[in-house]
Amino acid sequence: MRFKDKVVVVTGGAKGIGACIAERYRSEGAYVEIIDKTPGNWFIGDIADKDVLEEFSKYVLKKYGKVDILVNNALPLMKGIDDCTWEEFLYAQRVGVAAPFYLAKLFKDYFPKGSSIINISSSRDRMSEPQTESYTAAKGGLTALTHALAISLGPKVRVNSISPGWINTTEIEYDGPDATQHSVARVGRPDDIASMALFLSSDEAGFITGENIVIDGGMTHRMIYHGDHGWSFR
C-alpha cells in the first residue's frame, strides 16, 4: 500500500471526483479527512469561510499532528458576466483560490518532508464557454497558485495540479458524439482523475512539482474550425 498511515485531506470530498479520490486513498491505507458543505460523516463546513478553515485545520492537526497530502478539490460557483454578482464572483474565488492558499498556509508547518499538495483545476483554466467567468477565473487562479506554492514550499512539499475535462460523475451513459468527440472516444471518469492524483502524490512522481496535467481525452488539442472535418458553428 503506497499510502499506509498517510494523512490525506480532501476538500469537496462528499461526491463526484472528490469522493473517488478519497476512496482511492483509503483503499491504499491512508487516513482521509473530508470537508464538505453536504451533510454526512465528515467535517461539515463552507471552505469560503476563513473561520471554518481554521477550525477544520485545528481538528485535523489535533487528531493526527500532521498532513501528508492535501487535495484541493472543492467546486467553485459557475456563473457568467450577465448574471454573476460582485459577491458571487468573490465567493467563487474564496472557494477556488483563497481556500486552497489558506489551507496550505495553515498546514505549512505540519507537512512532513515528502508531502504533496494536489490542486484539482479544470481545462477551463485555458479555454471557455460563454457565461462561466466566476468558475474560469477561480480555476485559472488555482493553476497559477500551483506553481507559486511549488517554489515556496519546496523541497519539503511538492505541489501539482490536474485539469480535468468532461468527467461524468452521474449514472448516465454517454455515447455517440458526446463520446466520439474525444480522441479516446469516451467521456472521462472520476477514476481517471483519482489515478493521477495518487500518482502525483506518490514517490514515483518525486521529480514532478509545479506542474499542471490536463486529463481531457484530448479535447483541448482538437483544432476546430467551422466547415472542417464535419464541424459546424451554429
Model feature map: region roles:
Residues R2-Y31:
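Canonical Rossmann dinucleotide-binding motif of NAD(H)/NADP(H)-dependent dehydrogenases/reductases
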